[in-house]
Design a protein with these regions (language model features):
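Extracytoplasmic
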Residues: 590, 732-948
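Membrane-helix boundary/interfacial segments in multi-pass membrane proteins
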Residues: 382-395, 402-411, 479-491, 627-631, ...
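Conserved donor NDP-sugar-binding/catalytic core segment of glycosyltransferases
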Residues: 99-138
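Short, acidic, metal-binding catalytic loop of nucleotide-sugar glycosyltransferases
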Residues: 28-37
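Membrane-embedded helix bundles of polyisoprenyl
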Residues: 215, 445-458, 464-548, 557-573, ...
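Active-site lumenal/periplasmic loops and adjacent helix-entry segments of GT-C-fold
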Residues: 373-506
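Active-site-adjacent helix/loop segment of glycosyltransferases
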Residues: 203-301
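Periplasmic/ER-lumenal interhelical loops and adjacent helix-loop junctions
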Residues: 402-405, 561-650, 755-756, 761-766, ...
Length: 948
């Protein structure tokens, strides 16, 4: 007697397509079956008038209404009470069987008395030649493995029959087996339901068969099975359901002894899998991972019920399903096959060596050695805005954390993010961190050439233009000015900018680029806070364009770029805003130094427009004495002209974008030169405009390359090389005075000193890093500048903008002022005792910068007399750093920060470290990410994709 088939059709209107539309096709497909169903029960989840109307007209024996939150497993359990046939057919609104499907499923079920259920081949709703699912298995650790999915159906899997499980959609099960197994497990959250049913069927002694000739089209609404991963919310929903099901099955299938330990391991495994998700460039799955872990922790009653069901129906051992599992070897072969099936690469070879990149870097090394030969023998860089770094790596990172600052009595606050950059640099040479800066200076030209060359690969694939891009970037006037003047933050910002462009321009494509760009963005902002507004504007513009042109695909990756930088700067931002000093956030980090730079007038801004940040025309004013220098700014004109032409070529979109970057850089430079937010002693110091010019130079060079790449007809190809050569020669001539400044003795760089304090103090500082020195510097106007320094030297990483930019005094300032006034006058107070109580061991009367005025000379002599007459002060003598006195009383240790400060510092550090670690994990490339990258062109926005 033919088996009676009772179909259960579950409808839930939560798909992208209206449920009624899919339901009509499914009902029509049921009506076209060569072997009709004997009964149909529809379970309508939710209130949808369209679904209700279609269901009422379907001829179903009953229509059950259920809440919208009802799962497929719960809906089938409701309908099972009405099942009277020999077999149950599980369907959803988006499962449309082909006419022969049921007949073939019933035939297979009738021919196999030991078969509990049979499963069809699932194909795409709109393409029956594409396999969605054909059999499911799992690894030894319970990971679900599709035996065939997302493949072109060529009959390659039609010989497969015995499987461990299948997708639940379209399954035809014997009614008695269905009831004895207890139906679907409601705790699986909609994933692995067919696999779990198959495992339980196998353990009961039954078999599970595939019927590859029975085709069922599915749309992936997510009513039954997992939703199609078409949108980010759906992908997160799939990840949550899959992980929840895996954890649930792991606890259900485990031996009784192992269940407790597996339950304890859920959270540690979630931590490990979080790291793996970041390494796999899937940060969107981190939250579903933790949601699934927490759900598994509290669903122990569901685990107990599921284990009871298995125990009551089990008739076979677990060893019998072992052959049906997927081995690690088979899994590797399957992954290799998936990798081989990826679309062919669209990206050509980099051609770093064959395209001249290596020769460019080698030439830059030669030029650097010739320009700065003495640096090879130096251990510490001095001059300009340079100072030594602290001697130990631990101190380097301590100075980068929230807490006591290296200046002042009890100044507690956030460190500048630049201190973290210096800590990274210093860690590269841990035995002598100051030497790391020397190495950076010596390697700056080749590093700039390398960065410029790689940045050029995002604009053009022509070797000659890439070479030109690297050369122009390494010879940028603002970069050479920073090198010869000793501006470490500006040098590092210039070295980092091309890599930010390289990664940031493709950040919307991949998490690898986004992670790398986020670290570089944070580092650039740390080195050049004045660039923050321009870079934020550029980032917001990129986000808007991505929303408009890519329908939001990749927006999360672009948003992430700003996250690490924002977290690193957050403590400083909060401090400056709380003290009403928002402008102080733009201050150049490091030593506040009033070095030569153009004035905030028309002539100065004209030089800025030519890319020149110094009034001496980057050294040309003194290079040829008596020779007019009006023509020097014109040497950069070829680059500017080519950049302006770029929007008129086929690469108009790239040209406009790069011109906008140029405009943002120039606006930053123009604004910076007229803004003073930091003070060197009592004198305001304007922001260095060179970092803005570096950004402008990046856009101008990129625009010039884009113009030469696509702005010439094929018959004029030779003109491209000529134009690139002219631009390079012009900038090279402009760079000659800077490159020869050390040989001519005009460079501000010096060999050290290893300490900014006298050798006596430096020696004491090596023994005790907390030794205190109060430094008194007479002013030419007759006053005195005073500051307290801790350790054997003032250090570059010990500088803090919260101190150099403050516009109002703090309590420790008043204390320093009182001590200074009492020290330099014949006061009767025990000021030396106060110094000792505060932890100060030395008093240094520093010389005033030449020329010394009569007022400052008189003040210095008067102060020396007063200090010599003080009891408790022992004159060490005159040194190159000034006159030094030692406190002879018992000096108390410097007051330490409170426990609450340490707790706050630890919390801030952990949050910042977490953001950096996430960015690092995202930035590490994997084999899969490299394959994905090769599918996209290296050049961003090529003309054949942009149009005109």
């Amino acid at each position: 007697m033919p088996a009676r088939v009772h179909a259960i059709l579950v409808v839930r209107p939560d798909g992208r397509t209206p449920a009624a539309h899919h339901l009509r096709r499914t009902l029509a497909a049921l009506g076209e079956q060569t072997r009709r169903v004997d009964a149909l029960t529809i379970v309508a989840c939710g209130d949808d008038p369209g679904v209700a109307a279609v269901a009422a007209a379907s001829g179903a024996e009953s229509v059950i209404t259920a809440p919208a939150s009802t799962t497929f497993a719960a809906a089938t359990a409701m309908a099972t009470l009405r099942v009277r046939g020999d077999a149950v057919w599980l369907l959803a609104q988006d499962t449309a069987p082909e006419p022969e499907a049921l007949a073939r499923l019933v035939g297979a079920l009738e021919l196999g008395p030991s078969v509990a259920f049979v499963a069809p081949k699932l194909v795409r709703w709109d393409d029956r030649t594409s396999i969605v699912s054909l059999g499911v298995s799992m690894t030894g650790f319970g990971r679900t493995i599709e035996l065939a999915d997302d493949e072109l159906d060529q009959g390659q899997h039609d010989a497969r029959e015995d499987v461990l499980g299948s997708d639940v959609r379209g399954v035809l099960a014997r009614t008695d087996a269905w009831r004895s197994l207890g139906g679907l497990d409601r705790s699986l959250s909609g994933a692995d339901e067919g696999l779990d049913l198959g495992v339980r069927a196998r353990l009961s002694g039954a078999r599970v068969l595939l019927v590859p000739t029975a085709l069922v089209a599915v749309a992936g609404d997510g009513v039954a099975g997992l939703p199609a991963p078409l949108t980010a919310p759906r992908r997160r929903r799939r990840a949550f359901a899959s992980r929840t099901a895996q954890l649930h099955r792991r606890l259900v299938y485990a031996s009784p002894v192992a269940v407790f330990f597996l339950w304890l391991a859920i959270l540690p495994i979630a931590v490990w899998r979080t790291i793996l998700q970041l390494v796999r460039k899937q940060p969107g799955f981190v939250m579903p991972e933790w949601q699934a872990a927490l759900a598994a922790l509290v669903r122990l009653p569901s685990v107990a019920r599921a284990r009871t069901r298995i125990r009551t129906s089990r008739a076979a051992s677990w060893a019998q399903i072992t052959p049906l599992r997927v081995s690690q070897r088979d899994l590797r072969e399957q992954l290799d096959d998936d990798a081989d099936s990826i679309d062919p690469a669209r990206r050509g070879d980099l051609r770093f060596f064959t395209g001249g990149g290596a020769w460019l870097v080698l030439g830059a090394i030669v030029v650097s050695i010739a320009a700065f030969p003495a640096l090879a023998a130096w251990t510490v860089l001095g001059g300009g805005g340079l100072q030594p770094l602290v001697a130990g790596v631990a101190q380097l990172w301590a100075e980068a954390a929230y807490g006591l600052r290296a200046s002042g009595f009890d100044t507690i606050g956030p460190a500048d993010p630049f201190a973290a950059v210096l800590a990274v640099v210093g860690t590269l040479w841990p035995f002598d961190p100051s030497r790391a800066l020397v190495i950076v200076w010596l390697a700056a030209l080749p590093l700039a050439a390398l960065g410029g060359w790689f940045a050029a690969t995002r604009v053009t694939d022509r070797s000659v233009l890439r070479f030109a891009g690297g050369a122009l970037w390494a010879l940028a006037p603002t970069f050479l000015a920073a090198l010869t003047q000793g501006r470490p933050s500006a040098v590092l910002a210039h070295l980092l900018l091309p890599w930010l462009f390289y990664a940031g321009s493709v950040a919307q494509r991949s998490w690898v680029a986004s992670g790398a760009a986020s670290l570089l963005f944070a580092a650039v902002i740390a080195c050049a806070p004045s660039l923050a507004p321009a870079l934020v504007v550029a980032l917001v513009g990129a986000i808007v364009l991505t929303v408009v042109l890519r329908r939001g695909r990749g927006v999360a990756r672009l948003i992430w770029i700003a996250v690490p930088g924002a977290l690193l700067a957050a403590p400083l931002v909060w401090r400056q805003l709380r003290t009403g000093n928002a402008w102080g956030l733009l201050a150049d980090p490091g030593l506040v130094w009033a070095g030569p730079q153009v004035a905030a007038d028309a002539a100065g801004r004209a030089l800025l427009a030519a890319g020149i940040p110094t009034p001496d025309l980057v050294g040309w004013a003194g290079f040829l004495p008596g020779v007019p220098t009006w023509w020097v700014p014109l040497l950069a004109a070829p680059v500017a002209l080519l950049a302006v032409i770029a929007p008129l070529t086929q690469r108009w979109a790239a040209g406009i974008t790069l011109l906008v970057i140029t405009a943002l850089g120039l606006a930053t430079a123009f604004g910076a030169v007229g803004i003073s937010v930091a003070f060197a002693q009592s004198f305001p110091v304007a922001l260095w405009p060179g970092t803005g010019l570096s950004l402008a130079w990046l856009g101008a060079v990129g625009g010039a390359l884009a113009a030469l790449d696509a702005g010439l007809a094929p018959r004029l190809a030779a003109v491209r090389t000529v134009a690139a050569t002219v631009a390079m020669v012009g900038v090279l001539v402009l760079a000659v005075p800077a490159l020869t400044s050390m040989a001519r003795g005009t460079s501000l760089l010096t060999n050290g000193p290893a300490s900014t304090l006298p050798a006596y103090v430096a020696a004491a500082g090596r023994e005790d890093p907390e030794v205190g020195t109060i430094i008194l510097t007479p002013q030419n106007e007759g006053g005195v500048s005073a500051r307290v320094v801790w350790g054997g030297s003032q250090t570059l990483n010990g500088q803090a903008t919260i101190l150099s930019t403050r516009t109002a005094g703090i309590p420790s300032d008043d204390e320093v002022a009182d001590l200074t006034a009492n020290l330099v006058t014949s006061s009767a107070e025990d000021v030396v005792g106060d110094l000792a109580a505060d932890g100060v061991s030395f008093v240094l009367l520093a010389p005033v910068a030449a020329p010394e005025s009569d007022l400052s000379r008189a003040f210095r002599l008067s102060a020396e007399t007063a200090l010599n007459q003080r009891d408790g002060l022992d004159a060490v003598g005159d040194t190159a750093k000034g006159a030094l006195w030692r406190v002879t009383q018992d000096v108390q240790p410097r007051a330490s920060a409170s426990a609450s400060v340490h707790d706050l510092s630890r919390t801030i550090g952990l949050v910042q470290l977490g953001a950096v670690l996430v960015a690092l994990l995202l930035a590490i490339p994997t084999a899969a990410s490299r394959r994905e990258a090769r599918r996209a062109p290296r050049v961003v926005g090529p003309h054949w994709r942009e149009g005109r």
